[in-house]
């Protein structure tokens, strides 16, 4: 697959051949759905906790006699039917995380990259950094490719200057080529990929190098 490489000013510089085994696969909706759900589940804290009737503080004595009052039968004041009583089948702390097969996870990432490439939502840009670390300098670059849109920038490595410049920009995510996240990648309206990251992606996913 051929893609144009743009300068930070939005001008076309050259073309790059992207590996079809990464950017030209049939889109697998099921595995994408599975990968996004996996990430969201792994992020859940799962600390919600309620007390059952055995855990609520209070007396265990019977509040009134079983018969003769005309009222409902009560064993103690911690009954779930009473205000201040225990909770029936309430939530308890639990771990929502689960593992996903590595092959399925890799297929999900490649499917999302293929989807973005097929829908012209993937832009390859020459390698750049933001020496000043200023937000306004990065905004000027983004306006050429994803003005007002939710965007994802795929970097070759952890460029702290670019990340510092972009941390004030809403709906902007940074991903390293070897640590992609399905949720951010899928929901980003525009995926801006550095030229070096495009080459590394092909190598990382076990395919031939982009030319």
From Swiss-Prot:
Any one GO biological process: translation
Keyword check for RNA-binding: yes
UniProt entry tagged with the keyword Repeat: no
Region entry Disordered, spans: 52-79
Polar residues biased stretches: 58-68
Tree of life domain: Bacteria
SUPFAM superfamilies: Ribosomal protein L4
Entry GO CC: ribonucleoprotein complex; ribosome
Transmembrane regions listed in the UniProt entry: none
Keywords: Ribonucleoprotein, Ribosomal protein, RNA-binding, rRNA-binding
GO MF, any single term: rRNA binding
UniProt similarity note: Belongs to the universal ribosomal protein uL4 family.
Function: One of the primary rRNA binding proteins, this protein initially binds near the 5'-end of the 23S rRNA. It is important during the early stages of 50S assembly. It makes multiple contacts with different domains of the 23S rRNA in the assembled 50S subunit and ribosome. Forms part of the polypeptide exit tunnel.
Subunit structure: Part of the 50S ribosomal subunit.
HAMAP family linked: Ribosomal_uL4_B
Protein name: Large ribosomal subunit protein uL4
Species whose genome carries this gene: Treponema denticola (strain ATCC 35405 / DSM 14222 / CIP 103919 / JCM 8153 / KCTC 15104)
Name of the gene: rplD
